[in-house]
């Protein structure tokens, strides 16, 4: 049955509710009743028994709900809104000997709710003093706060004995019906598909030697569940596995846990393992695990991928395959004791490979279903009353950890996990079918024999060593121009080779990232988003002054009211397009144009239309009104124009704030001493006055508190911080802690993504005379005679200030529990550039390129950069431009203009060192056009060669260069939509002023015939002169 989007199988609800109601008396401890209290949803722990009970009975979790089971009936206490979904179930129990009662709470009547709780407690005490509850469950919420005091008092008053019923619940729902088996098949097939995706990503990363961490790789897989194109393909595979009366619903597909990737020498074979931040290590073994759940039914799969394995590794993996097969086929039998299964497994290992016994996992699996890991159904050495039974589902997981290869000394691990379902006759079948054959999971990238042969060959082909010059020689290595040039050319060749590999990798990644499904259908029409609005709901809302049959502008309702045939007709301002006013003779004509489908001005760039196209709809495109009252018509036209401007401005503000995410609340630190940093200025500031405030570190974030008002503060959560920077006062007048956010936050009505805390590094005061008596002066150390001491004091102050800020930045990172890491710029690697309106000093950090001194700030995360283009690189120009294109194609490109040409070689080297491919262009490119074509069809873009259209001669800018005078800078497009920062203020600055080249005219005067030899010719002549010289002194 479906009600408001919630579909409940009431037959399954009846069967399961009565099953538990009649079976609980046989639970351990013989409870007289069962009680389940669920408060707010706990997304951090979705596997609590009460939550699972709700999912088992209803298919959903009903927050703020109590469920109680008695000998002859069950009682559900919930809100009236939820009760309407459950009331149809009551009729199912009318002919049964087990009844259902639903008691409705009233959020506005506390006394009524209290009476319901007291009646329930009375029923519990009347049925007996032993109450079964899942004692490990923990929930929060308003209902818990209301219930808990009454319950604690009732336990004392009625001498209630509370026992744990968790094991009994597990035994009740461990057997799966046909519908539950279908859900498990769907989730297992989903796990197979995601494992296939994981294996492709892992092998590609190892093959391409990508620098990616285990956690980043797992995050990439985890985010794929939100990829609509991938889910569309997945749906067609999973739909046939659904129950016959259901269709696959992607909204019920979710992760049972975050995917896990483990490599290197650190392996954790427990279900609680997590991907670490170490780089993916492409040698030995890589463990990959993922689990999908569908309609809350879980599945699990783990595979080991062997990279260039030794014989010992493959032998141990083959033994693991045999061991898993033995457990599933021979030991997992109905009525078998889980402890016996584990002991027989250990005996088999001791018999075949005793050296692996100490490395074996502490269990080989557990019950699985709505609960990912049911502790009551563990298969380990611990004795349990649980027995293997038909229709159960198990996660069979086993492996050997902390193994050390005897040949190479490398630490590795092997592990396998599969979802196994027992049928009604007790026969096990493996639901996760992704391959685990050694031939399919072993990959060889480095052949040792080939490497040795190549090494011998290279040694044989080496030229004989040249005799070293002795100490009496007049020819020194650094004296010859040719030798210096040879070194530079060698470095350049290395850089070119590295760039070639980076471009090849970029092309391969592009083809892998985008498939045919990403290509936009040429016949597909662009999607329009239709604005929904209405001026008035009822006719009585129309202003009374419209009776004069004149044009009126209702600012409150954003409406133009026009008199048509003696009736006031409202037109919402969103329907108004533009208008004009003309005077002809004694009449003033007012023409109003309205939006309509197919009308001019509604082009491809229009993202929103005021109407939905429908052939049955009729539209007014324009109206012309005339009047002899010219002043009145002018005033009306002005009001309409102003109203349209206000509406447009409001819509632009709404779009600008569309990506603002509402943050969770900051949890203040109420235990221990709160770390703080005083006398801090903030940019941007919530106050109009410039006053220093205080920064506090709390449990889940930091807070800046202004001294002017208690509500004047900025809260920043650790989870929303993307980058945390510390910049010392070296070479600057301020010391900085800078926070770059993942999602912008609001400060007043302004959207901000960068927040900076700083303090001035020096307070300058100068005594120009130096003749005053020192003891009588306020600033007694500021005389000329103490200038050296003053400088030393200045250095000490700066060092102390840097130390204080650095410690506080590290304290922020430490309080984030590993979410953040402090990054600092390398000043020696910095260069001048113009990312916005003025020249600033840009500096690389470990992960970013930043400029934090002068707003607007610049933060470019290097791992998000797809490619860098160096523009206007020509002979005769003193500077060039940099353009960063991001992997997220929807993100505008970032420009850094007017970089000194002397920095070109250094920047090329730096880009190569951080694995960013670059190309060189002699002109400014039209990035709005390039990015639009790339966004429209990225798959075809990479099929056509990707960024190779820019790479021709990209690192040989001296070839085919023109020496004619060109403009140093031209905007790439009139529409600055590809710029990262743009405002109307930029119009005050002319391009000539911002990007002028003072020396460019030097190359324009005179013809080419008048010029002397270029630098290349002069270098050749000098080298020839060196060779002809006898180097005599």
UniProtKB/Swiss-Prot annotation:
- GO terms assigned for molecular function: nucleosome binding
**What are the coiled-coil residue ranges?**
99-124, 479-509, 638-659
Which stretches are tagged as biased composition: Acidic residues? 957-991, 998-1017
Q: Which SUPFAM superfamilies match?
A: Creatinase/aminopeptidase
Keywords, alphabetical: Chromosome, Coiled coil, DNA damage, DNA repair, DNA replication, Nucleus, Transcription, Transcription regulation
Covalent S-S links between cysteines: none
Query: Which GO terms of type biological process are on file?
Result: DNA repair; DNA replication; transcription elongation by RNA polymerase II
As for subcellular location, the record says:
Nucleus; Chromosome
Q: Which GO terms describe its cellular component?
A: FACT complex
Q: Where is the composition biased (Basic and acidic residues)?
A: 1018-1033
Region named Disordered: 454-474, 776-795, 953-1033
How this chain assembles, per its entry, is:
Forms a stable heterodimer with POB3. The SPT16-POB3 dimer weakly associates with multiple molecules of NHP6 to form the FACT complex.
Q: Which family does it belong to?
A: Belongs to the peptidase M24 family. SPT16 subfamily.
Q: What does this protein do?
A: Component of the FACT complex, a general chromatin factor that acts to reorganize nucleosomes. The FACT complex is involved in multiple processes that require DNA as a template such as mRNA elongation, DNA replication and DNA repair. During transcription elongation the FACT complex acts as a histone chaperone that both destabilizes and restores nucleosomal structure.
Q: What is this protein called?
A: FACT complex subunit SPT16
Native source organism of the sequence: Kluyveromyces lactis (strain ATCC 8585 / CBS 2359 / DSM 70799 / NBRC 1267 / NRRL Y-1140 / WM37)
| Taxonomic lineage from the root | Eukaryota, Fungi, Dikarya, Ascomycota, Saccharomycotina
The gene coding this protein? SPT16
């Amino acid at each position: 049955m479906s009600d408001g989007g919630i579909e409940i199988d009431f037959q399954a609800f009846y069967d399961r509710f009565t099953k538990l109601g009649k079976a609980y008396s046989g639970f351990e401890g013989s409870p007289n009743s069962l009680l389940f209290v669920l408060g707010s949803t706990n997304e951090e722990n979705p596997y609590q028994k009460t939550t699972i009970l709700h999912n088992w009975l209803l298919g959903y979790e009903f927050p703020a709900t109590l469920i109680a089971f008695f000998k002859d009936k069950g009682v559900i206490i919930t809100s009236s809104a939820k009760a309407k979904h459950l009331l149809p179930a009551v009729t199912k129990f009318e002919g049964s000997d087990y009844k259902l009662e639903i008691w409705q709470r009233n959020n506005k009547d506390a006394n009524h709710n209290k009476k319901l709780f007291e009646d329930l407690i009375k029923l519990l005490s009347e049925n007996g003093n032993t109450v079964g509850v899942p004692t490990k469950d923990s929930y929060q919420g308003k209902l818990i706060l209301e219930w808990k005091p009454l319950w604690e008092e009732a336990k004392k008053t009625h001498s209630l004995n509370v026992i744990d019923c968790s094991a009994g619940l597990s035994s009740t729902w461990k057997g799966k019906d046909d519908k539950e088996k279908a859900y498990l098949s769907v989730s297992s097939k989903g796990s197979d598909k995601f494992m296939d995706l994981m294996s492709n990503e892992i092998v590609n990363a190892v093959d391409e030697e990508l620098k990616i961490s285990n956690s980043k790789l797992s995050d990439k897989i985890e985010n794929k569940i939100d990829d609509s194109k991938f889910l569309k393909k997945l749906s067609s595979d999973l739909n046939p596995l659904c129950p016959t009366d259901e269709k696959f619903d992607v909204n019920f597909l979710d992760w049972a846990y975050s995917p896990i990737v483990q490599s290197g020498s650190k392996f954790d074979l427990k279900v609680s393992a997590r991907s670490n931040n170490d780089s993916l290590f492409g040698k030995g073994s890589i463990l990959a695990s993922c689990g999908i759940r569908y309609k809350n039914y879980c599945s699990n799969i783990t595979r080991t991928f062997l990279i260039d394995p030794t014989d010992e590794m493959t032998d141990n993996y083959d033994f693991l395959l045999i061991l898993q097969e033995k457990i599933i086929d021979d030991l997992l039998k109905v009525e078998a004791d889980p402890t016996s299964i584990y002991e027989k497994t250990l005996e088999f290992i001791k018999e075949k490979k005793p050296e692996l016994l100490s490395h074996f996992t502490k269990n080989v699996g557990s019950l699985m279903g709505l609960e990912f890991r049911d502790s009551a159904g563990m298969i380990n050495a611990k004795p349990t009353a649980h027995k293997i039974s038909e229709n159960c589902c198990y996660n069979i997981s086993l492996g050997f950890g902390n193994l050390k290869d005897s040949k190479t000394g490398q630490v590795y691990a092997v592990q396998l996990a599969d979802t196994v379902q027992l049928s009604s006759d007790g026969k096990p079948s493996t639901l996760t079918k992704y391959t685990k054959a050694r031939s399919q999971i072993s990959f060889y990238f480095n052949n040792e024999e080939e490497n040795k042969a190549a090494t011998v060959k290279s040694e044989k082909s080496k030229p004989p060593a040249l005799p070293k010059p002795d100490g009496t020689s007049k020819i020194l290595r650094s004296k010859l121009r040719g030798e210096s040039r040879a070194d530079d050319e060698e470095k350049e060749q290395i850089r070119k080779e590295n760039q070639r590999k980076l471009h090849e990798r970029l092309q391969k990644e592009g083809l892998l990232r985008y498939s045919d499904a990403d290509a936009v259908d040429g016949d597909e029409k662009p999607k329009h988003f239709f604005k929904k609005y209405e001026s008035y709901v009822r006719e009585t809302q129309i202003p009374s002054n419209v009776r004069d049959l004149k044009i009126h502008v209702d600012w409150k309702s954003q409406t133009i009211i026009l008199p048509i045939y003696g009736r006031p007709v409202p037109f919402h301002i969103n329907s108004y397009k533009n208008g004009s006013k003309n005077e002809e003779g004694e009449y003033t004509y007012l023409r109003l144009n309205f939006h309509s489908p197919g009308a001019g001005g509604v082009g491809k760039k229009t993202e929103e239309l005021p109407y939905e196209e429908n052939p049955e709809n009729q539209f007014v495109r324009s109206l012309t009104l005339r009047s002899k009252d010219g002043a009145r018509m002018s005033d009306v036209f002005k009001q309409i124009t102003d109203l349209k401007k206000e509406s447009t401005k409001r819509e632009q503000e709404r779009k600008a704030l569309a990506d603002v995410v509402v943050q969770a609340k900051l949890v203040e630190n109420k235990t221990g001493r709160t770390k703080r940093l005083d006398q801090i200025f903030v940019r941007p500031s919530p106050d109009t006055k410039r006053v220093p405030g205080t920064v506090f570190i709390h449990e889940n974030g930091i807070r800046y508190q202004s001294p002017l008002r208690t509500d004047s503060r900025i809260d920043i959560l650790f989870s929303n911080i993307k980058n945390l920077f510390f910049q010392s006062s070296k070479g600057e007048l301020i010391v900085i802690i800078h926070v770059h956010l993942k999602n912008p936050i609001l400060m007043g009505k302004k959207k901000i993504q960068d927040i900076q805390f700083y303090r001035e590094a020096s307070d300058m005061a100068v005594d120009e005379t130096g003749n005053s008596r020192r003891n009588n002066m306020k600033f007694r150390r500021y005389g000329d005679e103490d200038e050296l001491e003053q400088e030393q004091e200045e250095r000490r102050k700066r060092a102390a200030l840097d130390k204080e800020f650095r410690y506080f930045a590290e304290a922020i990172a430490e309080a984030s529990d590993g979410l953040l890491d402090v990054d600092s710029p390398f000043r020696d690697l910095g260069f001048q550039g113009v990312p916005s309106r003025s020249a600033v000093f840009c500096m690389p950090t470990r992960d970013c390129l930043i400029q934090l001194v002068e707003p607007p700030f610049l933060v470019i995360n290097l791992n998000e950069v797809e490619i860098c283009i160096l523009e206007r690189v020509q002979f005769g120009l003193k500077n060039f431009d940099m353009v960063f294109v991001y992997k997220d194609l929807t993100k505008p490109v970032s420009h850094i203009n007017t970089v000194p040409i002397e920095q070109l070689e250094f920047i090329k080297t730096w880009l190569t060192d951080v694995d960013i491919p670059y190309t060189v262009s002699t002109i400014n490119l039209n990035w709005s056009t390039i990015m639009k074509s790339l966004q429209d069809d990225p798959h075809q873009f990479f099929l056509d060669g990707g960024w190779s259209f820019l790479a021709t001669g990209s690192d040989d800018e001296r070839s085919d260069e023109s020496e004619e005078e060109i403009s140093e800078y031209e905007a790439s497009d009139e529409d600055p939509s590809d710029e990262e920062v743009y405002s109307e203020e930029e119009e005050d600055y002319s391009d000539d002023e911002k990007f002028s080249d003072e020396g460019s005219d030097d190359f324009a005067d005179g013809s080419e015939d008048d010029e002397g030899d270029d630098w290349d010719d002069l270098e050749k002549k000098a080298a020839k002169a060196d060779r002809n010289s006898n180097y005599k002194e």
